[in-house]
Amino acid sequence: MSDQNFSRLPKPHTTYANIIKSFLPIGDQEKSANAVLPNATYSVNTLEIDHDNLADYRRICGFENNSYVPPTYFAVLSQSLQMNMMVKEPFPFTMLGLIHVQNSVTQYRRIKDSAIFKMAVSFANLRDHDRGKQFDFVTKVFEKDELVWEGTSTYLSRQKRQKTTQKSSTTQVEAKPTLDSNDMHEFWEIPEDIGRRYAFISGDFNLIHLHPLSAKAFGFPKAIAHGMWTKAKCLGALGDLPESFTCDVTFKLPIFLPSEVEFIAKFDNRDEQVDFGVYDATTPKANLIGKITQAQAK
């Protein structure tokens, strides 16, 4: 097992040179088809919150400026370890082909931003998918010896498929729900520069988020919003979240910048569940589908 321990969270820019190299399609398709994830865990023994960065994060995502860590913030911090793992371990896929398809975070209690934490990130759950291979990054955050937060980010590595007569399964299309009187409903105007602004706060400088020209180089007609910014924006809009909960989201169609979108949240008091989504303002198409449920026991 390849474990690496850091005394402090590594800065994202330290991996950029290797990330650029990883964009090159080294290896053949057969190697990716027979991929094996490294058995690796990267951890930070002393994780202290940068309060200036946290204030910027709260502001751009719409979280209340209080003394607690927003539920998506550790997912952002974990990306530095994830990038290090992909460039330093024998990672079987090119980073260029990765698509962030799902994200789950669980907060076991409200977490003070003045505490000192330990964070550990591992590869997990490589499996087949209709369009290639999926795998997870699993992140756990401890305060002293108590597990206070954990998250799973699921990525898809698209692979070329052999020709077959069998029809592939159809992708489920999420339609915009009908509004009820007790639903939360907002229109958001998302500016063209949100990707650049969020990149400087999160450290995620993926070129598809920064500018139309760089996005076009990767097949997108315009720059697209970060999925984790969109998720955080939803949770910030919901406001008073439970002390302990799980929030699962699936990323659907990209949000091209600039855009107008609709945010809709439906509340089910019987199950203590919230179902929410972000939708194109002019069509029924979904950009993100999510739900908030009670956190299961650790």
Predicted regions: what they are:
Residues 1-102, 168-170, 174-242:
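Hot-dog-fold acyl-thioester-processing enzymes
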